[in-house]
Amino acid sequence: MDRQKALEAAVSQIERAFGKGSIMKLGGKDQVVETEVVSTRILGLDVALGIGGVPRGRIIEVYGPESSGKTTLALHIIAEAQKKGGTCAFVDAEHALDPSYARKLGALDELLISEPDAGEQALEIADTLVRPGAVDVLVVDSVAALVPRGELEGEMGDNHMGLHARLMSQALRKLTGSVSKSKTIVIFINQIRMKIGVMFGNPETTTGGNALKFYASVRMEIRRVGAIKDRDEVVGNQTRVKVVKNKLAPPFKVVDFDIMYGEGISKMGELIDLGVKANVVKKSGAWFSYNSTRIGQGRENAKQFLRDNPAMAAEIEGAIRQNAGLISEALAAVPDLDGTPVAE
């Protein structure tokens, strides 16, 4: 009884000093169990993430080799958030964002774009936007391009050991609290580097030290695994995403989809692939059929048929969403990015 009174006195003192809500019970009325999400606009990836999209109030890392679709994925998330009336910002440290491509993917003219000179400036802008809860989604493209001011002002060839990692570590310590309170999704796009002298295991690593690996609630590895051809012309990429880390659902799910040049992620190709996995679309040889109706010979013809018949496409999507659990199991059995099966 004395311990209970002591606890109540301690809680009361904490609330007087730091404000109501500074300490709460796990099962208290103030706690919200449901995680709010924003869809990635990729049906398979929403299923692979386990919660239906990327979580609000969390830090997300998207990394992969060059031209693998990292910025395209981030722009799709921005487009979805804007469609629901949200405000989004894009901190373009690489100075490489193509506004016309962003519009094609569905980004609206209200998207805030910043092209900072130094890494400190970029992260200060991010912190200023996140702290008051002014934005719903903030993308930093990319961590590798966040050049510390000391490096910018120094001579070419100067050694700046650990400066970049120190900058990221400090920024994430500041950001993580305000990201959670403001329910902002902060997406860091990152590049891959090779570790020298690694004889066994994966020599690849991401830039900016280890801090982002710890602070990120979701880490997604994105890679180009093949080309999509129309006769001899390459018209898109076959892309694979692996959920490397997930604090909100089981990780290591893998999903494949198509990115078409000038168009973005192909929804129809995904409906066919996931439809086959969920046993909604039947495949017999090269033919695809739905409810005994043949929809095309070959994947590209089936995609075109669904484009011409949006009602059937919507019906297939509804059936896939109902079979999300079945698809989730199938995604866990997809081969890893290096060809080995993913451990469940």
Swiss-Prot record:
Alphabetized UniProt keyword annotations: ATP-binding, Cytoplasm, DNA damage, DNA recombination, DNA repair, DNA-binding, Nucleotide-binding, SOS response
| Primary localization class, coarse | cytoplasm
Please give the InterPro entries that the UniProt record associates with this protein. Answer: AAA+_ATPase, DNA_recomb/repair_RecA, DNA_recomb/repair_RecA_CS, P-loop_NTPase, RecA-like_C, RecA-like_N, RecA_ATP-bd, RecA_C_sf
Q: Which Pfam families match?
A: RecA (PF00154), RecA_C (PF21096)
Subcellular location(s) per record = Cytoplasm
Q: Which residues bind ATP?
A: G64, P65, E66, S67, S68, G69, K70, T71
Biological process terms from the Gene Ontology for this record are:
DNA recombination; DNA repair; SOS response
Q: Please provide, in alphabetical order, the Gene Ontology terms of the cellular component aspect for this entry.
A: cytosol
For molecular function, the Gene Ontology terms on record are: ATP binding; ATP hydrolysis activity; ATP-dependent DNA damage sensor activity; damaged DNA binding; single-stranded DNA binding
As for family, the record states: Belongs to the RecA family.
The job of this chain, per UniProt, is described as: Can catalyze the hydrolysis of ATP in the presence of single-stranded DNA, the ATP-dependent uptake of single-stranded DNA by duplex DNA, and the ATP-dependent hybridization of homologous single-stranded DNAs. It interacts with LexA causing its activation and leading to its autocatalytic cleavage.
Its name, as the record gives it, is: Protein RecA
| Protein species of origin | Paramagnetospirillum magnetotacticum (Aquaspirillum magnetotacticum)
**Lineage, please?**
Bacteria, Pseudomonadati, Pseudomonadota, Alphaproteobacteria, Rhodospirillales
Gene that specifies this protein:
recA
